[in-house]
Amino acid sequence: MSVFLEENLTVTVSEKDFPVLLLTSNDSNSKPEGYNLDVDADNILHIDVAKMMLEGTDRSLEDEIGSKLFYLMNDVIRYANISKLQGYKILDESLQPKKTLVIIDSLDKVYAFVGEEGLFAFLTIMLNFGKTYNCFVEFVIKDVIDVLPIDLLKDCQTIVATPSLHKEAYYSFFDDKDFLDTILETQDSHFENIVSHFDKGHFLVSKKE
């Protein structure tokens, strides 16, 4: 996996780059300027937990969010089983799932409603099988809480980080420590846990070869 500092003010994530993990600041209510997802999707599912908390839902947030994640997992598993039956020549008809872009915004908030077990099950299915069955998932993290399965999330094809995060967030998700040491600088000793080297519009990117 290569790590680089993207200074061209834009990062475009194409289908081959999924699943993608976006690390951004907690006070950001919109996608970073210059960051784009390039997927020709038939459907888009944006699970915006903060918006759901603000506007409310007909059911409890635990039920609402849990059911959305369960539906996605069930859909991927169903197509995986269909593909297996086709491979065994039990089914002749070729069934291709529609392309779905899924944005989980944000994963740290989702955890609060589905718990560790639910989140781990969802991530495992999506990271291993989602893209294979046309489910392209972007995981957004705005607060790197201790309970997040970081080692599992590092299996994402692409990791993109914006400026001004806590220094430990970068070191948790990016393995090239020597490279990080050369680019992560602090502006003030009173804020030694805050990285201020990046200019607005720059991105730290890691992609699997």
Label each PLM-derived region with a short phrase.
Residues 1-23, 30-45, 49-51, 67-75, ...:
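Conserved P-loop NTPase motor module
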Residues 45-100, 110-115:
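Conserved helicase/translocase P-loop NTPase motor core
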Residues 96-99, 103, 115, 119-122, ...:
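Secondary-structure capping and boundary motifs in well-ordered enzyme cores
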Residues 120-209:
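Conserved ATP-driven motor cores of ASCE-family P-loop NTPases powering translocation/secretion/packaging/pilus
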